[in-house]
Amino acid sequence: MIQGSIVPNITIFDRDGRLDAAKTSWHMRWMFEHGVDGLFLTGSYGAGPLMSNDERVEVYRLARDVANRFQGKFLLPHVGCIDTQSSVLLAKEAEKLGAVAVGAVPPFYYKHADDVIIQYYREIIEAVKIPVFAYNNPETSRYTFSFKVVQQLQKLGLAGLKDSPLNVGFITRVAYDAQVNNKNFQVIIGTSTGWLPFYHMGVRACIAGMNNWAPEIMTAMLKWTYAGDEAMAKKAYLVMMDVSARLHFTDSTIASHMALYARGFDAGYPRKPMLLPPFSDPKYKEIRNDIRAAFETLGLEFTTGTHHVIEA
């Protein structure tokens, strides 16, 4: 079973749109040092749909090299593409590089019928020996999983479901069905939202965008949850929900870059067409103050880097 705090980590590019290997590796290392357990690579946050297959494999390699410096850290690459052939290729490359599992969003842009989606996952599952997770993200894929389709995919060997929309009726049915019927099938929530209630129904892993810029908060929340300190876990959950909402003023990838800059870390650039606001934008200072306040509320040390985007 995959457990812990996972990050859908951003991929950092340079001014000319090339992969910035040094900054991307630094960011992975920094998150691991602050308690993140695993990396969900080249997903929506990580600009996977904006990258070539070779670039995505290079990110997997960078992640492997960073993870190998730590104990107990793991890689869960996202391999979903608009076409089946590329998704299968990326799954095979991820397996070669030591990933514990792969996740795949359904083929996007075109609207596909259930039988097409099932065949897509069948080919990925049959191509590798490591677990394959489907990624339910209707906002980006134009496809919404049904309980019936999940059941069919389970028979083909699907290992689990990463779910982002958190339709309570759907996700509780999938999770409890697996528990009651002793299915080897895991639900991972694709957001920090809902962590506490879903933990109490058996969910043990979440993929949280906040880990990109405030992994300390997520680490503390999960630590208190696992320790049974319900009062502190609830307090951390409320703080997490508040500061997360404050960062949802723009695309999550852009917000993650901005939040890192607000903490004084050089986060390079997102890939175009995504654009960062100029550093003169007062939003950077507002973000810094919001994150600092969240840390102070939880008694966490607020560390900053040396990149002077804003005045302290």
Regions found by a protein language model. Give the residues of each.
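Active-site beta->alpha loop and helix N-cap motifs at the rims of alpha/beta catalytic domains
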Residues: 1-7, 11-142, 306
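Short glycine/serine/threonine-biased micro-segments
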Residues: 2, 36, 41-44, 78, ...
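C-terminal alpha-helical cap/extension of soluble enzyme domains
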Residues: 6-11, 34-35, 210, 214-312
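General structural feature for long, well-ordered alpha-helical segments within catalytic domains
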Residues: 23-27, 55, 59, 86, ...
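Catalytic alpha/beta core domains of metabolic enzymes, predominantly
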Residues: 126, 138-250
